[in-house]
Amino acid sequence: MKEKAAQHRLLADENTSHRLVSASRQLVKQFPIVHIASWQDGSWLGLDDAALLMSCGEAGLVLVAFDRATLPWHAGQVVRAGESHGGLVLFRRTVRSTDYGYQSRLLTGFWVDEGHAWDWLNRIVYLPKAP
């Protein structure tokens, strides 16, 4: 299924489940998220982290992921190289990768309350946010 670019702001990476996308859209009708496998016919699947981050920047997409080990490092490398990325939302270790309900509540709550209005260029946010 091909997705339209204008309606999306968030891109779920290949290590997140399609269930996160579905659960988010059940909570918030037309929530602006798409899974990478559906985005541009899956052409971004398998891109290395730096290329994916820069592609998200060019497309105006914020990447949603679990990869706390390498994505922040790659985002820093992109910025140090004088390039930009579209932003990154990472789930903290306390968020189980199979708890799609909790993930979707965190993401939709954050996005609706504040994230949608932010300038996401080169920004990284961890959910849940620290108190």
Task: List the model feature ranges, each with a label.
Residues L45-L47:
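Active-site metal-coordination segments of metallo-dependent hydrolases
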Residues M1-E3, M54-S55:
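Short, conserved, surface-exposed binding loops centered on an aromatic residue
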Residues E3-K4, R9-E14, H18-Q40, A50, ...:
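Acidic, PIN/NYN-like endoribonuclease modules and their adjacent C-terminal/linker elements
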Residues S55-G60, T108-V112:
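A general structural signal for short secondary-structure boundary/capping elements
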Residues D49, C56-V78:
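Acidic, metal-binding active-site segment of PIN/NYN-like and related structure-specific nucleases
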